[in-house]
From Swiss-Prot:
Record note on domains: There are 3 rolling circle replication (RCR) motifs. RCR-2 is probably involved in metal coordination. RCR-3 is required for phosphodiester bond cleavage for initiation of RCR.
The organism of origin for this protein: Human associated cyclovirus 1 (isolate Homo sapiens/Pakistan/PK5510/2007) (HuCyV-1)
Name of the protein in question: Replication-associated protein
Catalytic activity: ATP + H2O = ADP + phosphate + H(+)
Domain of life: Viruses
Protein residues bound to ATP: 166-173
InterPro entries (UniProt xref): CRESS_DNA_REP, Helicase_SF3_ssDNA/RNA_vir, P-loop_NTPase
Main location: host cell
Length: 280
């Protein structure tokens, strides 16, 4: 048997003693949300044995369970519900149980996710690691719940904007990435804006790179993301609070050539740019 980790398991202990039975009771009271152990006789051999089930408070390795009970017991991961195991282990009429059978299924899975979020460990990445099945099934609901109970504060700082323009191959993109890497906490803290309306994948990264830009972000939105006031960017199915500290924009053309609409004037845009460089 592999030494895997388990939270819910059933066990059989052949030819037990009363001390063994008492040890099972102590284990259940100390480590289980719900547990039951019953005395039985095998129908064909009349071998006395204990039939038990445990729903642990915390996952435990098979080797640890055997160390705390007995190395000779047979352990299996339980596939049935707590109530099914309760029925099975109590059929002889002589049994011990402690705690309440836990409800299984979606509601219990989601409650575990809620507990994690309320404990302050509720980033989407931590939920994905700790509760992968619930994350896959209920990603959208989990995301919205986190936004509701732990809203992201709006931006009230001026986002620093750097605009690098020049001919292809002059090193604009490389310089932007090098500078962003130096300022970001890690590579996951850098967001590359895809072309178009959507900001999918934006999660308040401190650094945003808008590479090879030639006017494909609407001018009014460009002015807003480069400013200091609260603003939400659009993702598919919702919005994200824009809070980034730095924006790099690279382009083959100067700011006065970015937009083609009548009466376009780049004064408001240039006023929001802290560093503007021609790289040749």
């Amino acid at each position: 048997m592999s030494n895997s980790t388990v939270r819910r398991f059933c066990f059989t202990w052949n030819n037990y003693t009363e001390l063994n039975y008492a040890l099972c009771q102590e284990f259940i009271k100390k480590y289980c949300k719900y547990g039951i152990v019953g005395k039985e006789l095998a129908p064909t051999t009349n071998t006395p044995h204990l039939q038990g089930f445990c729903n642990l408070q915390k996952p435990m390795r098979f080797s640890t369970i055997k160390k705390r009970l007995d190395n000779g017991i047979h352990i299996e991961k339980s596939m049935g519900s707590d109530t099914q195991n309760q029925t099975y282990c109590s059929k002889s009429g002589e049994f011990f149980e402690a705690g309440d059978p836990q409800c299984q299924g979606k509601r219990n899975d989601l409650q575990s996710v809620v507990d994690t979020i309320q404990a302050g460990n509720g980033s989407l990445s931590s939920i994905a690691n700790e509760h992968p099945t619930a994350y896959i099934r209920y990603f959208r609901g989990i995301q919205e719940y986190i936004k509701t109970v732990r809203p992201i504060p709006p931006r009230y700082h001026k986002t620093e904007v750097r605009y690098y323009h020049g001919p292809p191959g002059s090193g604009k993109s490389r310089r932007a990435l090098e500078e962003a890497t130096a300022l970001a906490s890690d590579l996951n803290d850098i967001y590359y804006k895809p072309r178009g309306t959507w900001w999918d994948g934006y999660k308040q990264q401190s650094c945003v790179i808008i590479d090879d830009f030639y006017g494909w972000i609407k001018y009014d939105e460009m002015l807003k993301i480069c400013d200091r006031y609260p603003y939400k960017v659009q993702i598919k199915g919702g919005f994200e609070e824009f809070t980034s500290k730095y924006i790099w924009i690279t382009s083959n053309i100067d700011t006065n050539l970015l937009y083609k609409f009548n009466d376009y004037n780049d004064t408001a845009f240039v006023r929001r740019i802290e560093i503007k460089l021609l790289i040749e």
